[in-house]
Each structure stands twice: as C-alpha cells, then as structure tokens.
Amino acid sequence: MTISHIDPEYQANTIEPSVQQDWENRKVFKVADTVEGKHRYILSMFPYPSGKLHMGHVRNYTIGDVISRFYRLKGETVLQPMGWDAFGLPAENAAIAHKVAPAKWTFENIAYMRDQLKKLGLSVDWDREFATCTPEYYHWEQWLFVQLYKKGLIYRKLSTVNWDPVDQTVLANEQVENGRGWRSGALVEKRDIPMYYFRITDYAQELLDDLDTLQDGWPQQVLTMQRNWIGRSTGMEITFPSANTEIYADGLTVYTTRADTLMGVTYVAVAAEHPLALKAAENNPELAAFIEECRMGSVAEADLATAEKKGMATGLFVKHPVTGEELPVWIANYVLMSYGSGAVMAVPAHDERDFEFANKFNLPIKQVIDAKGADDADYSATEWQEWYGSKEGKLVNSGEFDGLEFQAAFDAFLAKLEPQGLANSKVQFRLRDWGVSRQRYWGCPIPMINCDTCGQVTVPEDQLPVVLPTDVVPDGSGNPLNKMPEFYETKCPCCGGDARRETDTLDTFVESSWYYARYASPDFTGGMVKPEAAKNWLPVNQYIGGVEHAILHLLYARFFHKLMRDEGVVQGNEPFTNLLTQGMVLADTFYREAENGKKTWFNPADIELERDEKGRIISAKYSGDGQEVIIGGQEKMSKSKNNGIDPQAIIDQYGADTARVFMMFAAPPDQSLEWSDAGVEGANRFLKRVWRLVASFLEKGNSATAIDKANLSKDAQDLRRKTHETIQKVSDDIERRHAFNTAIAALMELLNASNKFEAKDDNDVAVEREAITTLLTLLAPFAPHLSQTLLAQFGTDLTEATFPEVDASALTRNTQTIVVQVNGKLRGKLEVSVDISKDELLAQAKALPEVQQFLTGPTKKEIVVPNKLVNLVV
C-alpha cells in the first residue's frame, strides 16, 4: 500500500465540508424501509424549528450520532432519521410579531436549521425528513382521530379549563406555573368550553403494567415519574346520605384510600363546581361569589396543595354512614372536581390539608389512629405530625372498630357498609383524560363537523386531510380560522345540511406522539406507516432526549403506540426499548441590576474575563463599555438569561468535530454539562495532536503492515496491549455504559502511548500503524470528519470500515511492575516476569541500588503481595 502525505496542520474548515459533500453524494446513510441482517433504529427527539440550533440540540444529536456510528462500525444497518415538530404556539406568536404567515416562518427556520444540522456531521438519512405541519403527515393523524372517535376513545365534553388570556388558548395543568401561563406569564383564568378528549384513562392500567417491561432499558427516575403520574390507588367509595333531602336528595359519594380513618371525619368538602355546591348557591349570593372566586383560580394540583386554604360552609349537611351524625358540607378550594367525585371526606387529624383547613375554620379535629400503640392517646396538635399518614397504628375513638389496624379496618368498614349500598372497593388513577383541543390556528385541524341536526360528525375518510390554510397571518386576536368562512363553512356528511367545521386544532403533543413510527416509511400514502416497515424498524432501539419530557411526551407516545397497535398499524406494546435522558447544558451568566431590580443579561461572547491561577473568574467586563458586570454563576442556557452559546460560532472557529468531542467529553450524558471555552480548546488540541501523529507517521513513509507477534519488543507489546485494551474499553463505554467521556479519555491515553512509541524496525512500524488506525476508527463516532480524512490515507473508507476486533493474546502480560517498599515507604520499582518465583522476586528487590541504602539493620519481615508489591521491614 502506498502511504500518502497530508498537510502537517489540522484544518477542520477545509476537510469538513468536503467530507459532508462526499456523504451526501454517495447517500451513505440512506436505508431502505425493510432490510436484511442486523439493524437498529436510533432516534433523538426531533427539534422544534425555532430558528437556530442551541447547544442542547448539539448534545442531543451528537449522542444519537455517536451511538448510530458505533453500531454501523459493528456491521449493523442503522436508521437515524430527522424531522421537525413544526406546529405550535411559538411559530404563531413569532408570526404575529413579524406579520408573516407561520408556515413561511417555519419553513425558513427549517431550511436554516437543516443546514446547521448537516454541518454537525450527523449520519442522518435525510430522505426520510418531514415536518409535522404538512398535510402528508397530519392526514394520518386525522385518520386515526376519526377511527378513535368512532370507537368511543375520543369524546367531547364541556370542561372547566385553564385559559391563558394572552395566548388565547387552553393550558394543561402542567403548563400552569404559580397560577400563570408557562409561556406568556399571564394570570390564568378558568373557563367552560367544549373540548375533545382522548380516553387515556382506558389504558391507565396497561400503561402502568408495561413500565415493568422497560425496567432494563429506561432510567429508574423516569419510570418512577410515570408511575406517580399514572397514580394507581386502591381505595373505597363511600356514600354519605343527605341530611337535607328536600334540597339535595342524593348523598355525597367520596373516594378515599384511607377508609380506616372514617370515624375521624368531622366535615365533608366539595369542589366549587360540584352539583351540591351549585345547588346550595342558588339562593345564596355570598356562596355564589365564593364559587366564582374558586373558579378563577388554578386547577393545577401542585398550586392547590400550596395555595392558601379557602372555604365556605354551604349550610347543608350529610349523615355519617356509620354513626348517622350530621356533618357540615363545605366548599373548599383544595378539592378538585376532576379527581374522584369532586368531594372528599375530611379527617383533619390524619390529613395535612384537612388539618390546615379545620384549624383555619375552627372545625372539630378527632384522632382515630394511635401510631404509638396506646389506646388512650388523646389528639395533640404538637404530636399530630408524628402519626399523620401512618398506617401502622391501631384505631382509637372508633367504637366497635377500636384496635383494628389499616387493612382489617378497611375490610370491616366495607363489610358493614357494602350491604347497605353505602360503600364499594375501587381502584382509581390520578391520570386524567387528555384534553387535546387548542383554540389556536397553527395546529392540525380536528377532523370534526358540527351540525345543528346531527351533532358532532366525523369528516369522511375520503375527504381527509382537512387542510389547514397556510397563507394566514394571525393578528393575535383569537383563532383566525373562526373568521374564515371559506374554511369553516361546509355540509354535514350525514344530512347534507349546512354545517360548521371544527376550528379548534390539536395539541401539538399529538404530532410528537407518533412521529417515530412515520419515519419507518415517511412517503407511504396508504396509512400511518407501511406494515412491513413498521415490523422491520419498530420499536425504536434507542431513544434520546431531555428528562423534561419524562412524563407528558413519553407517556403520550406510549399511549399512541398502544392505540396504533389496536388499530393494527404497529406491533408490540412499547415504542422505545431503551431511553437515554441527557442532562442540561449550563453556561456562565452575567448581568447588571437597575435600581428597580430589573436585570439586564449579557451574552458570554460579549464579556471580557479575568481569571485567577486556578482558572476561576474573578472579574468580568462588558466589551461594549468596558464596565464591570455581575457574575451570576452557571445556569441552563436560555434566552431569558442570554447565556446561550451559538453552535455555529463554535463550528466556524473550531469545526464540528471539536464541538462533538467537547460535548461528549465534558460530562457523562445524563448529567449537566458545564460549558467551558477552555474545554472546547482542549478538545481542539486533542484533535490537532491526532492529526500531527498521523502526519508524522505518514512522513516516515514506511508501509509495513504485518505484525510478527512472536518477535515483539517489550515496547511493542505494551503498545499492542494498550491498543486492544482501548478497543475493549471504548466498545463497552459506548454500547453498555453510554460513558462517552471515559471512552474519549481512553482514546487520549492511546494517543499518548502512540506518541511516546519509537519504532525501531518494520515490526514496530506495523504495531504503530495498528495503534494509529485503531485510534482513528474508535474516534470516528465522535470526530467522523477527521477520522474519514485520515483513514483514507491508509486506504480505508470510513463508511465501509468495521470496529476493530480485540486480540485476546495482546492483552496478556509477560511482565509486571512490582513496587518495592522499605518499612512501608516506596523506594523502588521492578519490571519482572509474571511467573517469577517469590524467592527470585525478593532477591531482585533487595538487589536494587535505590533499595539497598535503606537495608541497614537486620530484616525483620519480608511481605510479598503477589503481582503488586514487596515490603521489607527492617
């Protein structure tokens, strides 16, 4: 083989564009819908086309690309696709601000970001790219909606919702933060509007059970979060008969997981929207006003738990199902109409919220559990916390039920009340049905028609997709579709009469709940996904994304997979076999604070820093005026803190390979990564050293390739051992541990060993060549442009290269390093044969000149730790 020559200096900006062009010309990452042999589907969560990449994107997609390239080297066919989560509020709001159609804004952003992603060197099959805002995509989302509506898995109901008055849309509970909209920051109101819901609760048990099948592939933290969100509980429904049958004939039914505390109920609380509350308020203006006040508050559980407890007595009473005692009914702002029956039995002595409420409104507090085991223990406000929530104690102050523990009490109350029709055992879930209607324009049209005669009617399948007009420029005043008769005026498919098309659009979580399946056959026109392609590629082998998606996106995608399975679209029960949740990217923050407390944030690129000898920042000045700014510490890169680092600037200055290596080396993937300019420079220096090593080797012009294993020098044996140990470690670090940082550290060690090695004959040259080509191949998942360019000098095309095999014989050691101590202190080292005898080892240790000077007195003890050390005690 002829050895080539290369420029002595690494020029990323020269080599990277040509390598990327080569990949594109040869379509080396294109895969078929069905393939033979070993294959794998690696997917990073697709981006929202916000306008430009941020470092979180770079980290996410580099992780996916490292894994993809690794398995290609292992001989597998790998599908790694890319697309765009293109509907949603930000596009609409940007369109309002810039007076441009969201479609135009979105597709311009996609074009720019696609170019950025390609410059990162991702091994993506770009022929599978799609945007979720195209009719070709959402056609099949609408098709599924129609099927599910016909099966009763989607329904429409009037709902009290969180209404964001600025964004003019409904917010999920999770999108309300401290009573304000997560995006606009506006105070959230409550409104009653008709909405479409997915019956995700029909799948609650299966969604919970199937988490067990993900035990080996998903982070424990995510599984726990999903279990808690689904929130299965086994409890009892108990009915409290009405004491005011002339006003409210029905009793109040409550759900409780603590039926054992029934004898401690001192009042019953209902939600403001409960029918009993509304009945009581009919002739009570004060109560009606209070109900309205509650309605205007948040409906998010977290907010209700921490909000000030507010309440008002309805003047109505119910009877205790065991004693017949009359208990007052209160309206309480901490009771949710959407959970259980909208009513709770209040046991202030054994529930934190009830306790707080009872203290505020001077309601009785009756202890019925004694956690200490003393039957005569009286309730004490100071001791209350000790047995709040305890299931260990026995019942007290509970009449015939005294002395029973939790399960026995549960069974006894059920046995007493169930024959009277006042109780039954029930499993309940915290999970609520998924409201998907959004009162915005830039989303997938809901394929429903409202007819005065026929009610809600699905759009016929041959009329799908219902296409969203794309030439609309929203002005911010509600949904523009409501002002477009050309969109909403239609005929009823049932009676042929005039009808109105639904103008609400779908929650954008719907698009991201099935996109992974569409990638298997993005051009398929006969359904959501081609059956044989789904069978070939699904489920996704490795999914990568931020832990902030642990609950909603991942739960909805799991739900959709089951919906599609039940429609015969896909097989299997779960969409993602393995999940990697990467940590955030942090960067330094700098600001100035005005007298009114308002902070102005400065981008790190505009700051001149002074550091101490340990590299810590001791002063920072804004380059615009030379004046000092306050150092705010490291926080997640964000627009609000203006501390984002533009990936394009890093690529322009250092190249994509440097950005990739830094991102993978700076921290384990599941932990936060602290941005460091010095770290980027360090990654770049590493790649320059690799380049110089290869340039130096090629310069010598020796083409020896055959290794004579039987006649290796000790230095050559050491380098071969290091080479094959590195193969072993990098393989394990990438495949099993996802410890990309330690894989790169191992490559740095191999680089150092190769640099120190001095070849003295052809055998040495062949060993050095093996080390260098191995280094380049193992580095390829991290720095593919550099690796492809340099491997070509050795006659290897990276796109056809294979992961090096470990030579077990190279790992065996003929010699070992032994530490020699005198009285426990290091005095010398020996390089000896691995099968040296104990006597010979001691003799060589004592013969070391640097040891002999300390052997002045008689030797009391000779300690030999095999393969490690000799300690001579004198």
Swiss-Prot record:
Its EC number is 6.1.1.4. One of its GO terms (biological process) is leucyl-tRNA aminoacylation. ATP binds at residue 639. A motif ('KMSKS' region) lies at residues 636-640. It catalyses: tRNA(Leu) + L-leucine + ATP = L-leucyl-tRNA(Leu) + AMP + diphosphate. Keywords: Aminoacyl-tRNA synthetase, ATP-binding, Cytoplasm, Ligase, Nucleotide-binding, Protein biosynthesis. A motif ('HIGH' region) lies at residues 47-57. CDD domains: Anticodon_Ia_Leu_BEm (cd07958), LeuRS_core (cd00812). GO terms for cellular component: cytosol. Signal peptide: none annotated. One of its GO terms (molecular function) is aminoacyl-tRNA deacylase activity. InterPro entries: aa-tRNA-synth_I_CS (IPR001412), aa-tRNA-synth_Ia (IPR002300), Leu-tRNA-ligase (IPR002302), Leu_tRNA-synth_edit (IPR025709), M/V/L/I-tRNA-synth_anticd-bd (IPR013155), Methionyl/Leucyl_tRNA_Synth (IPR015413), Rossmann-like_a/b/a_fold (IPR014729), tRNAsynth_Ia_anticodon-bd (IPR009080). Its main location: cytoplasm. It is found in: Cytoplasm. Coiled coil: none annotated. It comes from the Bacteria. Belongs to the class-I aminoacyl-tRNA synthetase family. PANTHER family: LEUCINE--TRNA LIGASE, MITOCHONDRIAL (PTHR43740:SF2), LEUCYL-TRNA SYNTHETASE (PTHR43740). This is Leucine--tRNA ligase. It comes from Acinetobacter baumannii (strain AYE).
